[in-house]
């Protein structure tokens, strides 16, 4: 027992000693920091004193010079005033002498004039005067008509579209100033004591000396908790403020350093697409297609659709070259791309080529190789080229690749011409017993050597790369010169072969051209490696948007960076156009071909079974019941339901129970990320002509406007077709349920109302249910609307309009002329909340036929105790007694 107690005592002593040593070490580490900071403070204070003394001396000298200049100006002014006073004294004495002589002569007497008033008749007055010049004047009064004053109103800002309230415009938590209508006295009061804001904590403002102290301390000892705690003792600031200030100082010094200049001088092409689009994603609104959207705000949640645009390739015959460097100007590229995107390659293909005066036909029986050979080798088997005379034409072959050809194939095949178009450069196995082969060579069996030929060499031999090279890169210029020589030599060889050279001479040419093909391949690798990270990302984005259209990609995304032929070259050699087939050569493309393959896989996975049956798109059945939820239309009919704010969902494929749209009871819109075949997605209408303004239209029945992107027959054209947009219909028909979207409002005039204050008047006559305009304003919360409503009640005005469960429209400060339309129990207009492109908007419509210059009224739906005196119904009228009251005198759409 004694030994155990001694052991425990020794262990406790050791722990205490360790803790004491730890505290001593911490204190020892703090001591030098404290001493260094004390020395730094002394240096800062001494420097501060020297700076103050120097500043005082400079100020003293400046003040002395300024005082001397003011003294000189004052002295000059005094001398000038003395000379002026002397002249005035002489003239004053002369005037006094003249006045004395006049008094001596008796001229100083004044005439006494008396005026007498006499009322002759109503509205007239006679004035008579007595004296040396007696006169009588008759004055007639004119009564001016009474003109009422213009109704007072504050300045307002016109809005053609709703905007969200700015954060600094809120009245919640602020003391308001009210004006007493009787005594015109300003009263500062608040609705409740809870609205009085609590005093904010004062922030510490750092001086130059404190900044110098923080910078030196962090540079010498680093920024850790011990240094921050010691700095808090010398500087009256919190640790968080010191850490923030140190970061600011670090960034400020980084900008002035030389390394930051080098970083900023780098080209933006080295950045990736995500880094470049960082500010774009924060500022650009994908729903309104504008920057700095005032309606949806910045930094929105990015929602990308799961279904991407299908890859398409327009026929080259229907396209025009986009410029002098367009791939369409080179027939070899045109044929190559046409063959790349031709889906009917199961049978033979025939090409006609011209070289000098000779004309040949290429007959190919296509049969794909195995996947193993395609993965091991990215090269393409050649084809048989037969001349009109039946002679065999020999092509150039890569030496290193011809050695890998099986002997069985060599015994039965022979090399063919390299003048084939790139379109024919696929891995094909040539059948020597095809029917077309015997047709062109009757009675004579030909032997063809099968060889693997590099498709890069064929492309570069037929295309003069120096015409499209980038003059900014010297390496590419030198490579282009080499390719010009290769091109010329290849053409000479082709002519000789066509004239019928011997097989031995032809094989020598093959050996020479194999080296040229390898040099061409090296140049191609350097050309493809010149693509920066941003250019590659832009190219992939162009593939996603425009498909395999190098013209549109170069024009819209790579303008000034790459030409059309360079994009086509990269597209062909990188295997983007063949991404759907296992025939890619990844020796050059590398990971970027895999990225494009990922794009294709995502696109194929996004397509549902409904689009994959029988190899063609299946038409969806549109009915008025499939447009959305029937319950939405039922709630729309009564006019008393509260609309729900829409927010796009980011669901992939089909929406489930966790979908935010389904949870809130709204339909998925075109801005959602879900599939087009989602059961919760609103599919628009396919109404016939002039049916979109009836209850049979699912859009109109659901209080929605038709969307040209969703509805089948409701489309808009605003051009002549020069930009590829659809032409206008010949009958001039246009959907009548897109007035808010197209802003086709009537002309509204502003004038004095016969009811109260200002009023809105229609300029031209309108018919029943015609769209008049939109009620715009600020989008505020319901809490903000309650606070503002108390202020508006004091001014006996109402500009609040219930929009949905999240926002209220306030047109007091910002709005349009329809905000002046007054309330009436027997209105000629009505307000209706419509869903336009995912946003709720208030439209004003004519309830009946309205003549020109007639004032507009609509029912605010006041409660019995909320309507002002001028808006109350006359006694005995019991119409609409059951009007629904919405908060504080808010306007409500039916």
UniProtKB/Swiss-Prot annotation:
Basic and acidic residues bias spans: 872-884
Record-linked CDD domains: SANT (cd00167), SET_EZH (cd10519)
Pfam family, one: preSET_CXC
One annotated GO biological process: methylation
Top-level EC class: transferase
GO function terms (MF aspect): chromatin binding; histone H3K27 methyltransferase activity; histone H3K27 trimethyltransferase activity
Region (Disordered): 1-25, 395-447, 491-513, 867-894
Low complexity bias locations: 1-11
Cellular location(s): Nucleus
Domain SANT span(s) in chain numbering: 527-577
Superkingdom of this protein's organism: Eukaryota
EC numbers, comma separated: 2.1.1.356
Basic residues bias: start-end ranges: 425-435, 885-894
Keyword Methyltransferase tagged: yes
GO cellular component terms, semicolon-separated: nucleus; PcG protein complex
Catalysed reaction equations from the record: L-lysyl(27)-[histone H3] + 3 S-adenosyl-L-methionine = N(6),N(6),N(6)-trimethyl-L-lysyl(27)-[histone H3] + 3 S-adenosyl-L-homocysteine + 3 H(+)
Main location: nucleus
Function text: Polycomb group (PcG) protein. Catalytic subunit of some PcG multiprotein complex, which methylates 'Lys-27' of histone H3, leading to transcriptional repression of the affected target genes. PcG proteins are not required to initiate repression, but to maintain it during later stages of development.
Name by which UniProt lists this protein: Histone-lysine N-methyltransferase EZ2
């Amino acid at each position: 027992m004694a030994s155990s107690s001694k052991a425990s005592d020794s262990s406790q002593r050791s722990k205490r000693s360790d803790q004491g040593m730890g505290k001593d070490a911490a204190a020892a580490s703090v001591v030098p920091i404290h001493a260094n900071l004390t020395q730094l403070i002394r240096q800062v204070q001494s420097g501060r004193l020297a700076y103050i003394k120097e500043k005082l001396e400079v100020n003293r000298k400046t003040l002395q010079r300024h005082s001397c200049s003011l003294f000189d100006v004052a002295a000059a002014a005094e001398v000038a005033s003395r000379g002026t006073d002397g002249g005035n004294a002489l003239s004053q004495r002369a005037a006094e002498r003249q006045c004395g002589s006049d008094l001596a002569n008796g001229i100083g007497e004044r005439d006494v004039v008396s005026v007498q008033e006499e009322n002759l008749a109503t509205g007239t007055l006679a004035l008579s005067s007595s004296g040396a010049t007696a006169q009588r004047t008759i004055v007639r009064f004119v009564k001016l008509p009474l003109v009422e004053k213009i109704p007072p109103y504050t300045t307002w800002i016109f809005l053609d579209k709703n905007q969200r309230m700015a954060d600094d415009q809120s009245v919640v938590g602020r003391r308001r100033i009210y004006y007493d209508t009787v005594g015109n006295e300003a009263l500062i009061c608040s609705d409740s004591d809870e609205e009085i804001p609590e005093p904010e904590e004062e922030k510490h403002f750092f001086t130059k000396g404190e900044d110098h102290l923080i910078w030196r301390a962090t540079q010498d000892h680093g920024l850790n908790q011990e240094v921050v705690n010691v700095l808090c003792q010398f500087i009256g600031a919190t640790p968080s403020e010191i850490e923030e200030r140190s970061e600011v100082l670090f960034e400020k010094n980084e900008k002035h350093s030389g390394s930051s200049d080098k970083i900023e001088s780098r080209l933006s092409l080295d950045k990736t697409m995500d880094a470049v689009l960082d500010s774009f994603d924060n500022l650009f609104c994908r729903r309104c297609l504008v920057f700095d959207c005032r309606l949806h705000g910045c930094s929105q949640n990015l929602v990308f659709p799961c279904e991407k645009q299908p890859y398409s390739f327009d026929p080259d015959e229907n396209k025009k070259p986009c410029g002098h460097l367009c791939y369409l100007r080179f027939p070899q590229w045109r044929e190559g791309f046409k063959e790349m995107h031709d889906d009917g390659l199961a049978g033979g293909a025939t090409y006609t080529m011209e070289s000098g005066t000779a004309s040949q036909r290429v007959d190919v029986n296509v049969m794909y190789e195995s996947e193993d050979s395609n993965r091991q080798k990215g090269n393409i088997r050649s084809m048989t080229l037969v001349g009109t005379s039946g002679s065999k034409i020999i092509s150039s072959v890569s030496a290193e690749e011809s050695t890998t050809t099986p002997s069985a194939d060599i015994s039965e095949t022979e090399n063919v011409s390299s003048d084939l178009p790139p379109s024919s450069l696929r891995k094909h196995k040539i059948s020597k017993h095809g029917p077309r082969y015997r047709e062109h060579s009757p009675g004579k069996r030909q032997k063809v050597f099968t060889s693997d030929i590099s498709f890069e060499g064929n492309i570069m031999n037929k295309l003069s790369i120096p015409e499209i090279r980038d003059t900014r890169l010297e390496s590419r210029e030198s490579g282009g010169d080499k390719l010009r020589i290769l091109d010329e030599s290849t053409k000479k060889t082709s002519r000789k072969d066509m004239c019928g050279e011997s097989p031995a001479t032809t094989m020598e040419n093959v050996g020479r051209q194999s080296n040229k093909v390898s040099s061409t391949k090296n140049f191609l690798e350097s050309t493809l490696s010149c693509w920066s990270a941003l250019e590659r990302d832009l190219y992939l984005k162009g593939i996603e948007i425009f498909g395999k259209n190098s013209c549109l990609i170069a024009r819209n995304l790579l303008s000034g960076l790459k030409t059309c032929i360079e994009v086509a070259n990269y597209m062909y050699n990188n295997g983007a156009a063949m991404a759907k087939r296992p025939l890619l050569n990844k020796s050059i493309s590398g990971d970027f071909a895999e990225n494009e393959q990922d794009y294709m896989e995502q696109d194929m996975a996004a397509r549902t079974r409904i689009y994959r049956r029988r190899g063609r798109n299946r038409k969806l059945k549109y009915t008025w019941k499939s447009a959305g939820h029937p319950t939405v239309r039922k709630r729309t009919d009564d006019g008393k339901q509260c609309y729900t704010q829409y927010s796009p969902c980011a669901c992939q494929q089909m929406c489930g129970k966790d979908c935010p749209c389904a949870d809130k009871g709204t339909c998925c819109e075109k801005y959602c990320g879900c599939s087009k075949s989602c059961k919760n997605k609103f599919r628009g209408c396919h109404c016939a002509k002039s049916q979109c303004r009836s209850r049979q239209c699912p859009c109109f029945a659901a209080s929605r406007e038709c969307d040209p992107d969703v509805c089948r027959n409701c489309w808009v054209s605003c051009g002549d077709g020069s930009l590829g947009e659809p032409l206008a219909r010949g009958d001039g028909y246009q959907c009548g349920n897109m007035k808010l979207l197209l802003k086709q409002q009537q002309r509204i005039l502003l004038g004095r109302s016969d009811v109260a204050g200002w009023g809105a008047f229609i300029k031209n006559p309108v018919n029943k249910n015609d769209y008049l305009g939109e009620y715009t304003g600020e989008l505020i919360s319901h809490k903000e609307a309650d606070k503002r409503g108390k202020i508006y009640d004091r001014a006996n005005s109402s500009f609040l309009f219930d929009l949905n469960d999240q926002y209220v429209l306030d047109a007091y400060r910002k709005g349009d002329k329809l905000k002046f339309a007054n309330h009436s129990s027997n209105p000629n207009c009505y307000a209706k909340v419509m869903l336009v492109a995912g946003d709720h908007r208030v439209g004003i419509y004519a309830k009946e036929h309205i003549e020109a210059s007639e004032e507009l009224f609509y029912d605010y739906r006041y409660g019995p105790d909320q309507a002002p005196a001028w808006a109350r119904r006359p006694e005995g009228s019991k119409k609409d007694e059951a009007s629904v009251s919405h908060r504080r005198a808010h306007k409500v759409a039916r």
